UniProtKB/Swiss-Prot annotation:
Its cofactor is pyridoxal 5'-phosphate. It is found in: Cytoplasm. Its EC number is 2.9.1.1. This is L-seryl-tRNA(Sec) selenium transferase. InterPro entries: PyrdxlP-dep_Trfase, PyrdxlP-dep_Trfase_major, SelA-like, SelA_trans, SelA_trans_N_dom. It catalyses: L-seryl-tRNA(Sec) + selenophosphate + H(+) = L-selenocysteinyl-tRNA(Sec) + phosphate. GO terms for cellular component: cytoplasm. It is an enzyme of class 2 (transferase). Pfam families: Se-cys_synth_N (PF12390), SelA (PF03841).
Amino acid sequence: MTTETRSLYSQLPAIDRLLRDSSFLSLRDTYGHTRVVELLRQMLDEAREVIRGSQTLPAWCENWAQEVDARLTKEAQSALRPVINLTGTVLHTNLGRALQAEAAVEAVTKAMRSPVTLEYDLDDAGRGHRDRALAQLLCRITGAEDACIVNNNAAAVLLMLAATASGKEVVVSRGELVEIGGAFRIPDVMRQAGCTLHEVGTTNRTHANDYRQAVNENTALLMKVHTSNYSIQGFTKAIDEAELVALGKELDVPVVTDLGSGSLVDLSQYGLPKEPMPQELIAAGVSLVSFSGDKLLGGPQAGIIVGKKEMIARLQSHPLKRALRADKMTLAALEATLRLYLHPEALSKKLPTLRLLTRSAEVIQIQAQRLQAPLAAHYGAEFAVQVMPCLSQIGSGSLPVDRLPSAALTFTPHDGRGSHLESLAARWRELPVPVIGRIYDGRLWLDLRCLEDEQRFLEMLLK
């Protein structure tokens, strides 16, 4: 060991001496004595490695307390951090999909802070059923006879098939054998549920007679799957639920539908593309309809199944139901969200998902123009900051080919270097409240459709 190396090692402080320093008192109060000591030992090991490798001290050796504070502050950050979603995708799966209504947030808070009547009947002091209150609401909204709630729509499809078709065949059109995110495929789910897939028709055309010819003594269900995350256009043919139900009655085979997104209101009244609604399928005679809680419905992640009482009873009594059931926070949020649908006149104001989807391009354009000046003043030396028209998407596999006119702030590097865009995007992801946009066509785009808190946005970007 050289004299220089020995000198560097001698400059490393003892942990006891550091802990006696007044600057470490608040750190120990905040993070605990044990964690501070663990980190100091780790940092001393790191410093020794640097000395061995480069014959220098790490820069942070000038201020150990500051480095400890920085590391522990970062370590203490929640894994689920709030972000500002300016990607242009309203129901962004990676960012948690639907924002919850204030009523849902309040309901969850109450459910977390107090015992609740989750499975307790106040009338007779006996055991109740956790789905009962929501089932009544869902029946009122959809016209179904009964309802069942699980933790997501994938679970709903699995339970629906396992409870009603295990060991038997389920007939599905080849054009509806969907795959959603995370490699969730209808054929795979059927195998897990113990069903045999009997696919009929072709990718683009399926006729009623295809279903008729497929039915045999081992057929349990005729199934429709709403292709919510893709669209087949051109020379196509598909039969709707009403026609399939008529065929099912003739052949004595029930019809079930995986609706996916599941809007409970006609979106066309808000100028949005229409999606099939559970209540329409129930009216058409479908025996079971499954859909998501956290997509177009605008509530928490949940799988909802509505339909005929006898079929729902089979789901409720299946062993998988307990494994897939929703917890009290999910049920509280979902109940509060569903109650908003009882007052449709105020829905677009009280339900964040619908409020964001129905923002007009003109309003967003005015907002973008208002924000452009301060951002151009701050970033103008490196980037051209402009207001540009753009198209938002709904996301989460909902209405895949439809886009919503919107407006964006774009940042274009004066030197045209893409690395500057990557650097800017990375900088914004490191903010206390990260700002998430998207890089496209040589620009960093901030689609403002989902921006409601302008003050917080400017506070972040003008740091």
